Amino acid sequence: MGNGKEEDYNFVFKVVLIGESGVGKTNLLSRFTRNEFSHDSRTTIGVEFSTRTVLLGTAAVKAQIWDTAGLERYRAITSAYYRGAVGALLVFDLTKHQTYAVVERWLKELYDHAEATIVVMLVGNKSDLSQAREVPTEEARMFAENNGLLFLETSALDSTNVELAFETVLKEIFAKVSKQIQNSPRSNAIALGSAQAGQEPGPGQKRACCINL
């Protein structure tokens, strides 16, 4: 999967990051979108997102990745955060079992606010800290399989599987969209979710319409 031109895209996919504070969501976001990692552990406040345009086959896909940015500490994430999302990475810290123990609650909250067809990946982050592991790989994988989720272990610190995690989610979304396009006379320039539907494309951009998974 390669980088496309930021100003030219065929699809916009909103993907949300969810999970407990301190599991590494912000660093996964910055590693994927900017190839950066911050050792500063201070929690960021306020919802923010970053984008990266990638190529899936011949299609340019603009991934709009949203980060809770600390709001999960106060249980203050609103339905607006989930609105229009077609993908989600549910992240836990594999060195802190308590962050894994609440994964089911996060999944329920996600399904309460997002479309049932949303593509979800369970992500065990901080795989570089293998000596401090508290969550067995097989336990998390089994939970993912039983709940119809994708699963990967990642390290935002050393980049392990970060690209693969986002790439896999985006490909799954793209496969669903492509299947719908085959059965639809609509334009092939499609944005998913109400948040993107109202955006006006800039110079060189392809106008997008809206489709639900």
Swiss-Prot record:
Residues 211-213 form a propeptide. Its cofactor is Mg(2+). This is Ras-related protein Rab-25. The modification Cysteine methyl ester is found at residue 210. SMART domains: RAB, RAN, RAS, RHO. Expression is restricted to epithelial cells. Expressed in the gastrointestinal mucosa, (highest expression seen in the ileum and colon), kidney, and lung. A very minor and variable level of expression is seen in the splenic tissue. Its main location: membrane. Belongs to the small GTPase superfamily. Rab family. A motif (Switch 1) lies at residues 35-49. It catalyses: GTP + H2O = GDP + phosphate + H(+). A lipid is attached at residues 209-210 (S-geranylgeranyl cysteine). One of its GO terms (cellular component) is cytoplasmic vesicle. Its EC number is 3.6.5.2. GO terms for biological process: epithelial cell morphogenesis; positive regulation of cell population proliferation; protein transport; pseudopodium organization. Regulated by guanine nucleotide exchange factors (GEFs) which promote the exchange of bound GDP for free GTP. Regulated by GTPase activating proteins (GAPs) which increase the GTP hydrolysis activity. Inhibited by GDP dissociation inhibitors (GDIs) which prevent Rab-GDP dissociation. It is found in: Cell membrane; Cell projection, Pseudopodium membrane; Cytoplasmic vesicle. Mg(2+) binds at residues 26, 44, 67.
